[in-house]
From Swiss-Prot:
The keyword ATP-binding applies. It comes from Xylella fastidiosa (strain 9a5c). Keywords: ATP-binding, NAD, Nucleotide-binding, Nucleotidyltransferase, Pyridine nucleotide biosynthesis, Transferase. Coiled coil: none annotated. HAMAP family: NaMN_adenylyltr. This is Probable nicotinate-nucleotide adenylyltransferase. The keyword NAD applies. The lineage of its organism: Bacteria, Pseudomonadati, Pseudomonadota, Gammaproteobacteria, Lysobacterales. Pfam families: CTP_transf_like. GO terms for biological process: NAD biosynthetic process.
Length: 222
């Protein structure tokens, strides 16, 4: 069976149970290991609420007991080495160079990120580098929320059978249907700063890391 390399990019600020649910579902559906790649400070989004090293460490803790999942620090390392902004297209160009032109590569992302893909650097180049697997997210309807310029690039690329992704190196889209999880990083951060209940959205190891390192305003809690 041809090999398949799956990368799940995100800010993971912090990584929560919704992220893990998507990664587990992709691992089961695609029968391939999932490498989660935390971004450096993303140029198209606000600066993360914790440092890149904190986000990487939380991600490592979250996947440490998850078969088939791993944390890949390549994007943080490249941003630190080159002292410049981090872009997904650069990561995928690097991965494609490493794995060669015939290897099947998948970039996994949530539907909420996908509908804003046209804000990413050189987003039109992505089909030449990778397949895209889009995980459904609460409140996102791709048929109605996809900008016209994205629809022109992507609408003819959808496939129904994920086996197509393994048998071709790049260029297709597939929708990962899994039970939507309402967890979000912004909700977790807001709950922490408001001294509300937040631990249920995180693994115990990540929750303890946040307490220990006083992240997201938790030091303001009495």
């Amino acid at each position: 069976m041809p090999s398949l390399h799956v990368f799940y990019g995100g800010t993971f600020d912090p990584v929560h149970v919704g992220h893990l649910a998507i990664a587990r579902a992709a691992h089961a559906a695609l029968q391939a290991p999932i490498a989660l790649i935390p971004s450096a400070d993303p140029p198209h989004r606000p600066t993360p609420g914790s440092s890149s090293m904190d986000r990487l460490r939380m991600l490592q803790l979250a996947v440490s007991k998850e078969p088939g999942l791993s944390a890949d620090p390549r994007e943080l390392q490249r941003a630190a080495r080159q002292n410049r902004s981090s872009y997904t297209v650069d990561t995928l160009t690097e991965v494609r160079s490493e794995l060669g032109p015939k290897t099947s590569i998948i970039w996994l992302l949530g539907a909420d990120a996908f509908v804003n893909l046209s804000n990413w650097k050189d987003w039109q180049m992505l089909p030449a580098l990778t397949h895209l697997v889009i995980a459904n997210r609460p409140g996102i309807t791709l048929q109605t929320q996809l900008p016209p310029k994205m629809a022109t690039v992507f609408n003819h690329r959808w496939v129904q059978d994920p086996a197509t992704l393994r048998n071709t190196p790049h260029g297709h889209l597939w929708l990962l249907n899994q039970p939507p999880n309402p967890s979000s990083a912004s909700k977790v951060r807001a709950a922490i700063s408001a001294a509300a209940h937040w631990e249920a959205d995180l693994t115990p190891e990540v929750a303890q890391y946040i307490r220990t390192h006083r992240l997201y305003g938790i030091h303001d809690i009495n």
